[in-house]
Regions:
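Alpha-helix capping/hinge segments and adjacent helical runs
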Residues: 4-5, 22, 26, 32-45, ...
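Internal helix-loop-helix
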Residues: 80-171, 218-220, 424
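Flexible, small-/acidic-enriched active-site or ligand-binding loops
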Residues: 248-274
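Extended, charge-enriched "interface" segments that sit outside catalytic cores
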Residues: 1-110, 129, 540-541
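A glycine-rich, basic-preceded beta-loop-alpha segment at the flavin cofactor/substrate interface
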Residues: 246-248, 270-298, 315-332, 466-479
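C-terminal helix-coil-helix/basic helical segment that borders enzyme active sites and/or dimer interfaces
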Residues: 349-382, 398, 471-480
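C-terminal amphipathic alpha-helical interaction region
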Residues: 455-541
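A short core secondary-structure module
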Residues: 207, 211-251
Length: 541
């Protein structure tokens, strides 16, 4: 006998057939404005592919089936390997096919390649964020290695620049594609890498023997890691491959995988170097300088990844509100809910504008002024955006209600993932101290800010007032005010981009909402309509 106790209605269908690129008006505009309009058709193709139920299911599977550490084989021999679910490998294959790991480093890379790569990264991050960790590290390490690959590894250049993902356990020179990891932090130091105790001994052939450990060694299956270790000349950077030139495994012992709050798909490991062999990059004592060259790019990716996850959470929320009816009308038409969603969309508008201006600065970093822009605003963006992510996703959960608190909605996974980008590559205080370091020591930084703010001076009174407040704080930037200064700098960076490129009503609305310290700002109906149209590709009004 068949029972039917009720009919299911007024429940939105899953958001699993959307174009992640074309539905984001702010992103489409930013890509073209910042010099990568030539990639728009390809981005639309990627956006359609990644927005499907099949792609989204890969993200789910990779997280509910986390990696497994294989220390030994059945006969007791060391393996020091990690086994991943097939979904992980398919996600990685798509990332490499779309060149998210090396687009900007191709010999014939087009102007705007960094911008195009940022957009591709953002689209993939909305499907599954953990797989971006190996991609980020490989992207940041590749330009350094193209200049400094040790002599025994010159055959790595071709696979470093390929569009192939190769998970086979083989020496790098025999593979079609490569991944590069980084090993910096140790038990006693964390962000204080100068306290690292891993020690080295120079060998007759010019290589070094490493003895020590790393506390967080992400992507242990990488073909090589860039490792910080102590030498007679100070903290130095070493190229430590998985396989030695003679084909033997390097003595890198995988001890334990971290049991993390989020980022479940990605393997983070504790390792020990038991006479591992590495090759010095640069000179002894240059470790910090070389790591900082890569650190800016990894920090940018942290901010971009958090922004992408915020974008996905917002998409889920507004899609639900568009279909769900309450008190006789769609939820999105309820005044308070419409105001909440519009404020969320406005926040994303400002972040998108600043992040892709940053991508352009990275693309043109050969210009001293652009390099300084990236140097200042990258840590500021990482600090603010990564901190905003958690309450933003929680707000999206509230839009969905109880179902948003359930795993099927994607939102719990996004919420658990959010804190990692605030911690990786330097936590909040480290970012703020870095901003203060630039403000106190970098020549030309105040001229740069003055030029950026003068360009839009007089267009909005809230912006001008905020500039004056920041100027007062910067007369003597105290360390204990580092967070406030960094936050204000970020807001003014966003505001300057909005005033320069957004419609005047939207730019002024952004400035009032984000910079008016009194609060209580009501967005006009027209601004709300414009924001929600842009945020959904013209679907939700």
């Amino acid at each position: 006998m068949h029972w039917q106790t009720h009919t299911v209605f007024n429940q939105p269908i899953p958001l699993n057939n959307s174009n992640l690129y074309l539905s984001d008006g702010a992103l489409c505009e930013a890509v073209t404005r910042e010099g990568a309009g030539w990639d728009s058709d390809f981005l639309a193709s990627i956006g359609q592919q990644l927005g499907t139920a099949e792609s989204l299911e890969l993200g789910r599977l990779a997280n509910v089936n986390p990696p497994e550490l294989l220390r030994y084989d059945a006969q007791g021999r060391r393996l020091d390997d990690v086994r991943f679910h097939p979904a992980w490998h398919l996600l990685m294959q798509a990332l490499c096919t779309n060149r998210v790991h090396n687009l900007a480093w191709e010999e014939d890379a087009r102007s705007g390649a960094f911008v195009a790569r940022a957009a591709r990264f953002m689209l993939h991050a909305q499907v599954e964020a953990g797989s971006l960790c190996p991609i980020t590290m490989t992207f940041a390490a590749t330009p350094l290695l193209l200049q400094m690959l040790p002599a025994p590894f010159q055959d790595w250049t071709t696979p470093l620049l390929s569009d192939r993902y190769d998970s086979h356990l083989l020496p790098g020179g025999q593979k079609r594609g490569l991944l590069i990891g980084m090993g910096m932090t140790e038990k006693q130091g964390g962000s204080d890498v100068m306290s690292n105790t891993t020690r080295t001994e120079r060998l007759e052939d010019g290589s070094y023997r490493l003895v020590g450990h790393k506390w967080f060694f992400s992507v242990p299956q990488s073909d090589a890691h860039l490792v910080l270790a102590q030498t007679a000349g100070g903290l130095s950077c070493f190229f430590v491959p998985r396989f030695l030139p003679d084909g033997q495994r390097n003595a890198i012992r995988l001890e334990r995988l971290k049991d993390k709050l989020g980022n479940r798909s990605n393997a983070s490991c504790e390792v020990e170097f038991q006479d591992a062999i590495g090759w010095l990059l640069g000179q002894e004592g240059e470790g910090i300088r070389l790591i900082l060259k890569m650190g800016g790019m990894t920090r940018f990716d942290c901010a971009l990844g958090s922004h992408a996850m915020m974008r996905r959470a917002f998409s889920l929320a507004i899609y639900h509100a568009h279909q769900r009816h309450v008190f006789g009308n769609p939820l999105i038409q309820q005044p308070l809910m419409r105001h909440v969603l519009s404020r969320m969309a406005l926040q994303l508008e400002g972040q998108t504008a600043l992040l892709f201006r940053l991508a352009r600065a990275w693309d043109r970093r050969a210009d001293a002024k652009e390099a300084l822009w990236a140097r200042l605003f990258t840590p500021a963006a990482k600090f603010v955006i990564c901190k905003r992510g958690m309450p933003f996703v929680a707000e999206a959960m509230e839009v969905l209600g109880g179902i948003g608190y359930c795993e099927e909605s994607e939102l719990p996974r996004l919420y658990r993932e959010m804190p990692v980008n605030s911690i990786w590559e330097g936590s909040g205080n480290i970012m703020c101290l870095d901003v203060l370091r630039v403000l106190n020591k970098q020549a030309g930084v105040y001229d740069l800010l003055s030029e950026a703010f003068v360009e839009v001076k007089g267009q909005d009174r809230y912006f001008d007032r905020a500039v004056r407040r920041l100027q007062q704080q910067l007369r003597k930037p105290a360390e204990e005010l580092g967070r406030e200064i960094t936050h204000q700098l970020f807001l003014l960076g966003c505001g300057a981009q909005m005033l320069k490129y957004a419609s005047p009503p939207m730019a002024q609305a952004w400035c009032q909402v984000m910079l008016d310290t009194r609060g209580g700002v009501r967005l006009s109906e027209q601004i709300q309509n414009d924001l929600l149209l842009r945020a959904t590709g013209g679907v939700c009004v």
